[in-house]
Amino acid sequence: MVKKEGVKKCALDDSELLIELQDTEWPFTYTDHDRQIARAIVYDETGFFYFVRAQREDDFGKVVTIETSGGGVEPGEDLRSAVRRELKEELGAETEVVCKIGLVSDYYNLVHRHNWNHYYLCRVKSFGDRNLTRDEREAFHLSTLRLSFDGAVREYERCRVSALGRLIAARELPILRKAMEIIENGGERNAD
């Protein structure tokens, strides 16, 4: 294992990342649940990336964040189906799963949760209507961000002003960089 910038990384195979992170923003008391999450770095043929912007005021504070589209895996649902469903709901995107990027294990101590974030690289085929939940519309005020790679990195850095933004950036910037590496190297790997 190689340690870089406080992040432990090792290859699951020759191409997938495994990143293990601790919550350094809130004190640990206990963890009472694990959450399986399917997430994606989404890009189009012109080189733009798509993310969600959340503007929220809750236990995590009054914050604005950038985050990959994704969410909880439903009972009986496989990871690839979950990521496609989440991308359709949150971005209105029909996508092709190019490959699995990796797995990030992280914690939200404030809500006593351990997250298993399964990241995929997905290419946009088309956009249609989004199907946001009530909370996504009214509590998180989700909107879509279309950014260049450099613009996305700047936005993650800008959102580090909040504790939640720092946790998200620590989890997602290494994944975004790996996704860009895959795209630059042809992007064609087995998605399974």
List the model feature ranges, each with a label.
Residues 2-39, 45:
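Acidic, metal-coordinating catalytic segment for phosphate/diphosphate chemistry
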Residues 32-33, 62-65, 112-116, 136-141:
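A generic structural micro-feature
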Residues 43-48, 57-58, 74, 121-129:
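Short, charged/polar surface micro-motifs in flexible loops or helix N-caps
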Residues 48-89:
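Conserved Nudix-box catalytic region and its N-terminal flanking loop in Nudix hydrolases
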Residues 94-103:
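A short coil-to-beta-strand element that immediately follows conserved catalytic motifs
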Residues 106-131, 145:
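Active-site-adjacent beta-strand/loop module that shapes the phosphate/pyrophosphate-binding cleft
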Residues 129, 135-192:
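Nudix hydrolase/Nudix homology domain
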